[in-house]
Regions:
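Cell-envelope and extracellular/periplasmic
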Residues: 1-291
Length: 291
């Protein structure tokens, strides 16, 4: 399943039917293009070793911060999050004050009318209705997409009630810019605790993929006070202090300035080794030692 990237202010019970989200697809050359590379190699190794079908839920959204994956109730208790709520509210109000809300409503009405005309023409010809029906959510305030808790509300909460074996969490790069590293020490551990509550499993295995080395600048690679290394340290400390978690190192999987490793296999393989050893209890030579 690939979950469409989206952020919403309120927790959702289901995925919107119009974009086909939440539908299982069998892995094939036609469907694999939408899958995370790391998740693919992770699932491939599990499948080969366990010889059972492996279901992967790909809920990924580039550029998010840890606070986008934590419940609003939890975030409201964190003093470091107050500036982010204030900033979001100001941006949303500015969008309304500039008349963008009314303009978006007019665009939606226009686009919907045009789509309905095409649908009627297709029906008259006995043809299938055209895809791409305008989604009202796409005409909402764009700042909602990055609302604190937004990604959790739209992409994780509809999965509530699903029984899962564990989670891999690969995020942190965007928290290394500006002052975004400051709340990370509180928000990142909260991701784990909140997800365990959502899936009603206080011991839910949680694989922490440490952010890769993604810059040729010496300061970002070797200066332990640089924010990228502060994030890695916090990921390490969270692993040390949180039971039933694993730390998957990806620092050496990158060889150029790209923010994500272009070598997906080592990261997926290491994640699978951790899962096989700790989640599935396979100890027959599968090495998964953490750093």
């Amino acid at each position: 399943i690939r979950i469409e990237p989206e952020g919403l202010p309120e927790p959702q019970d289901d995925f919107p039917s119009e974009n086909g989200a939440g539908i299982w697809n069998q892995c094939s050359p036609e469907t694999i293009g939408d899958c995370s590379g790391v998740a693919y190699f992770f699932g491939q190794r599990l499948h080969r070793r366990l010889d059972v079908p492996i279901g992967l839920v790909n809920a990924a959204w580039g550029g998010t911060m840890a606070q986008h994956w934590v419940t609003r109730r939890t975030l409201k208790t964190l003093p470091t999050m107050k500036p982010y709520f204030t900033d979001h509210e100001e941006k949303c109000q500015a969008w309304i004050d500039k008349g963008a809300e009314k303009g978006a409503a007019r665009r939606l009405a226009k686009d919907l009318k045009e789509w309905e005309m095409r649908a009627k023409e297709a029906e008259a010809k006995g043809e299938k209705k055209p895809g791409g029906k305008p989604n009202p959510r796409n005409y909402q305030n764009p700042n909602q997409g990055r609302i604190p808790s937004g990604a959790l509300n739209a992409m994780i909460m509809p999965l509530k009630g699903l029984t899962i074996q564990g989670a891999l969490f690969y995020q942190g790069e965007n928290n290394s810019f500006g002052n975004s590293w400051i709340p990370f020490r509180e928000t990142f551990p909260s991701v784990i605790s909140d997800w365990r509550k959502i899936f009603q499993d206080p011991k839910l295995p949680f694989g922490i993929i440490q952010i890769a080395g993604w810059s040729t600048r010496r300061s970002m690679t070797y200066d332990m006070n640089h924010h990228t290394n502060v994030i890695r340290e916090q990921q390490f400390l969270t692993w040390k202090n949180t039971p039933n978690t694993g730390l998957i190192v990806s620092f050496d999987a990158n060889s150029d300035p790209n923010i994500h490793p272009n070598r997906k296999y080592p990261v997926g393989d290491r994640s699978a080794r951790w899962a096989l050893s700790t989640v599935y209890g396979i100890k027959d030579g599968t090495r998964s030692e953490n750093p």
